[in-house]
Structures are given as structure tokens and as C-alpha cells.
Amino acid sequence: MKILFAGTPKPAAIVLEHLLTDPRLEVLGVITQPDARRGRGRSLHPSPVAEVAEGAGLKVHKWHSLGASSEDAAAVRETLAAYREAGATAVAVVAYGNLIPADLLDAVEHGWVNLHYSLLPRWRGAAPVQAAIAAGDQETGATIFRIEQGLDTGPMLSKKAYEIGIRETAEEVLIELTNSGKSLLADTLVELGEGSATPQPQPEEGATHAPKLHPADARIDFSAPAKVIQRRARAHTPAPGAWCTLDGQRYKFGLMLPVAEGEEFPELAPGQLWADKTRVLVGTGDTPLLVETIQPPGKKMMRAADWARGQQELLAQSPRFDIEEDTAK
């Protein structure tokens, strides 16, 4: 089966690498975002997908937009028509980053076939993995569906569930879903080509939305229950990074865990820090949390216990992270 591929970030590049090794599929070309400025020098770099595609000798198209009124409009439509003539029957999509205009949805026989990181219709949108963890979902998964005009509303072609571990971060779940989703996408594309795939419309019942994340969404309010805080920290690791302020300085948090059953700890106000030789605890709206990793201002993420050993003067003052009622004053 001949296909095109559209994607941009590292997870999409991993999927592309898998599709390129599948003897049942032939990738004719790749669509990705234009080169972007990264790093300290702010020099232009190709997307991870572009790097994989160029390394494989594939033609790469770096259009700014697919819209009919964009400067690339004519080139986009002429190129897709040429690929269709060459036998491409589907566009595999993984985190491409641009909207697919209505007039291009049927540019090839089987349309644009997307790998989405949730069990649709739950968590439609840009941040499904983070939303699932923050909500306390015990299960998520990957869904392959055909793109239509609505946001992640198209008919589903296949699904695969994944159980979320109680310590797993968004990064870790994303890796697992990429690894399972790449095979699911390949198999589904082959089924489409063979005519054995059975599209299923998405029910509206149970539909939820996961909008794009912003740094403000990752702010921790330590007056919330411990389980809510712990989920938020896992959901926003590594990016944008769960954070809170102490004396006007921003600290980021990695893994935070509930204290073990029967473990002794002092009574702590929400946001209050406490440490002994082996533990760093922070107060919440109910039971304290054990802080495993922390990123102080201007530093890298480190073990909280190591950080605390150099902060005896600070900890002796019973410091307290800001909570929402403090910052609202």
C-alpha cells in the first residue's frame, strides 16, 4: 500500500521509522512543519520527522499552511494530486500540527488517517495524555481514526487500550502509546488497503476535551488534595513542568508520592516544606506528599533529598510555597 506521512515531533518520527520498515507499506513522501529555531543559538533546525525522512531519501514538503488562501495553496494541491496519481491512497498523520482543510480531506482515496493518544471520544484535543493523567484515569490508549472537519471527531478504525501506572508521567505514557500506536497504525493502514477496515462513528456520549497546555495550567495549588497535586505533577512532566513559587522564585516539581501508610510525619500547612535526613515533604490540603525530585531556580532537576541537604537555613524557617489564596491578595 502506498501512503504519505504527515507529522512533526519526535513521537511522529518514531512512528515514521516503523512505517518505513514495514514491507506492506511504501511511503512516497512526507509532510512536516517548516524548520524551526531551537537551542541557545536559535539556529534553524529541521523537525525530527524531516530528519528521518531526509535520511531515508524521501521527498519532504515543509509547508507553512495547507489552507486554500495560503501562499503554499497551489503547491499543496498540485503535489497531493501528483501523489494520488502515483498511487498513494492514504495520508498517515501523527502530531502534524496544521489543520487539514475540508477540500483536502478526500485528496487521496482513504483520506487522512490519524493516530490519536486517547481512547476516543474521551480526550479529544491537543493534550490527551496529560488530561488523562490529571483526571486520574486508570486507562487510556491509542485510537486510529479518519480525520474530518470536527476536532478529533472522525470515524474510528481501531483502538488499543493502555493501563496508566500510578507513578507514570506524561512522557512515559506518551512513549508507551507511541510504541503500541505505531504498530496499530501500520496494521490499520493495511486493513484499509485490503478493504477489511470497518469505520465506527464516534459516540458523543463520553466525549471530553483536552486543550493545548500553557505554563499557567501547570501551576500547583498546594491547598488541593494530595492526589490532585500528584496527578498534576505527573501530567505536566517533563513539559511544561509542574511549578509553584517560594519567595517569588519558581520551583518545578518532578515525581511526588503519597506518604506510605503508617509513616510518621509532622503536621504541615498547605505548601509548607519539611525535611529530615532522607525525606522532603510538602503539605497539601489533606496528607503531605513526599517530594522525590525538584528543580530549584536556575538549576537542573535533582533529587529533593540532595537539594535539602544544602538548604538547612531555609528549611529551618518552615518555608511555605505560595497557594492561590496567597497570590490572589
Swiss-Prot record:
<keyword id="KW-0808">Transferase</keyword>
<protein>
    <recommendedName>
        <fullName>Methionyl-tRNA formyltransferase</fullName>
        <ecNumber>2.1.2.9</ecNumber>
    </recommendedName>
</protein>
<comment type="similarity">
    <text>Belongs to the Fmt family.</text>
</comment>
<dbReference type="Pfam" id="PF02911">
    <property type="entry name" value="Formyl_trans_C"/>
</dbReference>
<dbReference type="InterPro" id="IPR002376">
    <property type="entry name" value="Formyl_transf_N"/>
</dbReference>
<feature type="binding site">
    <location>
        <begin position="118"/>
        <end position="121"/>
    </location>
    <ligand>
        <name>(6S)-5,6,7,8-tetrahydrofolate</name>
    </ligand>
</feature>
<keyword id="KW-0648">Protein biosynthesis</keyword>
<comment type="function">
    <text>Attaches a formyl group to the free amino group of methionyl-tRNA(fMet). The formyl group appears to play a dual role in the initiator identity of N-formylmethionyl-tRNA by promoting its recognition by IF2 and preventing the misappropriation of this tRNA by the elongation apparatus.</text>
</comment>
<dbReference type="InterPro" id="IPR036477">
    <property type="entry name" value="Formyl_transf_N_sf"/>
</dbReference>
<dbReference type="GO" id="GO:0004479">
    <property type="term" value="F:methionyl-tRNA formyltransferase activity"/>
</dbReference>
<dbReference type="InterPro" id="IPR005793">
    <property type="entry name" value="Formyl_trans_C"/>
</dbReference>
<dbReference type="InterPro" id="IPR041711">
    <property type="entry name" value="Met-tRNA-FMT_N"/>
</dbReference>
<dbReference type="InterPro" id="IPR044135">
    <property type="entry name" value="Met-tRNA-FMT_C"/>
</dbReference>
<dbReference type="Pfam" id="PF00551">
    <property type="entry name" value="Formyl_trans_N"/>
</dbReference>
<dbReference type="InterPro" id="IPR011034">
    <property type="entry name" value="Formyl_transferase-like_C_sf"/>
</dbReference>
<dbReference type="InterPro" id="IPR005794">
    <property type="entry name" value="Fmt"/>
</dbReference>
<dbReference type="GO" id="GO:0005829">
    <property type="term" value="C:cytosol"/>
</dbReference>
